[in-house]
């Protein structure tokens, strides 16, 4: 049962969130994309957005297409896998995925 709900990240505006992953520091890694909205340049939106545990934007990994899902993997848990409609991208990051 959830309680004390609050807005952490506002997705209002152009673009939309998709898959989400968390790292061991509590940062939120979100797949993001333009969603084909008129007048929106997808090159500015497509990729992965990283937020602090308090919801502050920290980084944007740009991809040539919308990131539909993502997860951490690799031997040390510091490789970010990003899936889109046509491609799978992977990059080593200075973070480790949270253990489930």
List PLM regions with ranges.
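Short, solvent-exposed loop/turn segments at conserved positions within beta-propeller repeat blades
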Residues: 37-45
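Structural signature of WD-repeat beta-propellers
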Residues: 43, 83-84
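Blade-edge beta-strand/turn elements of extracellular beta-propeller
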Residues: 1-12, 48-63
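Short glycine/acidic-enriched loop and turn motifs that connect beta-strands
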Residues: 35-38, 87-89
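Hydrophobic/aromatic beta-strand positions that recur at structurally equivalent sites within the blades
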Residues: 50-51, 91-93
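Short loop/turn segments immediately following beta-strands, especially the blade-tip
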Residues: 1, 92-100
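A short loop-to-beta-strand structural motif that recurs across blades of beta-propeller domains
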Residues: 46-49, 87
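Beta-rich, blade/repeat-based domains predominating
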Residues: 6, 11-32, 64-79, 85
